[in-house]
Amino acid sequence: MSLASGPSSKLLLFSLGMGLVSGSKCPNKCVCQDQEVACIDLHLTEYPADIPLNTRRLYLNNNKITSLPALQLGFLSDLVYLDCQNNRIREVMDYTFIGIFRLIYLDLSSNNLTSISPFSFSVLTNLVRLNISHNPHLLYLDKYVFANTTSLRYLDLRNTGLHIIDHNGFHHLVVLQTLYLSGNPWICNCSFLDFTIHLLVSHMDHPDAQNATCTEPAELKGWPITKVGNPLQYMCITHLDQQDYIFLLLIGFCIFAAGTVAAWLTGVCAVLYQNALRTSSGDDTEDETGSRFANQIFRSNTHLGPIRRFPELI
């Protein structure tokens, strides 16, 4: 009897088939056990292949990975924990995590992130902890980045290149409890006022509040951003500097000068118009007087009767 027809061979084929379906193969040099895959300190430059499809916890930290492929990640529909810290990931594209909507924990800290697309986290409605700290080239966060992460409770933004942030981006984070903001070059100008007010009224925990300070302007350098609300409000809403008064004075003078010139031009135009009217009426009067004089002569001749003719000599 051949191996292909025996019961043991059928069992082997069935086991192999189940293995392919469940994706039980483990990536080279990684450690796989109990739905957990650890590919740590392996100097990987790419996302590893052959990750089991039933993986729930994936550790890719301390490698040289430059990007996260949405297609391969999308097969891990049961993934709840993803650690990618200390890699070389440069950007997170729209819908990178579209297939792992059950994700609860995401760590992208200590990478080379320069941008995060507005819809990068759009499907991560179950995300509870997000760490994107220590990305010094990350200068900007779109206000829609956190629009759908409504379950987020922990957010770490330490030591990035962020210097300004839109307070509207935090309106959807209604359950956010802990926010780290230190180590960023915050520019505390009037555009920053709304965010400082949000920090005060949201009652979030800021464990590093004393180290989250302003770098500009000079008069607010070193101020904790959680305490800079009142000085900013004074500077931006109720306070006028000497330069502001000079500017207002110049505006007032320009308005006065423009009004004076406009009034003078109006007066000149009115005088010229009146003179033109008078000249026109004078000409009309002379024409009317001449007409009357001619009519009087004609009438006087009419009263004298018919004009006598001299007798004809021949």
From Swiss-Prot:
Residues 184-238 form the LRRCT domain. Residues 24-53 form the LRRNT domain. Its main location: membrane. SMART domains: LRR_TYP, LRRNT. Residues 24-244 are extracellular. Disulfide bonds join C26-C32, C30-C39, C188-C214, C190-C236. N-glycosylated. GO terms for molecular function: potassium channel activator activity; potassium channel activity; transmembrane transporter binding; voltage-gated potassium channel activity. The keyword Transcription regulation does not apply. One of its GO terms (biological process) is potassium ion transport. The keyword Iron-sulfur does not apply. InterPro entries: KCNMA1_auxiliary (IPR051432), Leu-rich_rpt (IPR001611), Leu-rich_rpt_typical-subtyp (IPR003591), LRR_dom_sf (IPR032675), LRRNT (IPR000372). Testis-specific (at protein level). At the mRNA level, also detected in kidney, ventricle, spinal cord and skeletal muscle, although at lower levels compared to testis. Expression in testis at the protein level requires the presence of KCNU1. Residues 1-23 form the signal peptide. This is Leucine-rich repeat-containing protein 52. The gene is Lrrc52.
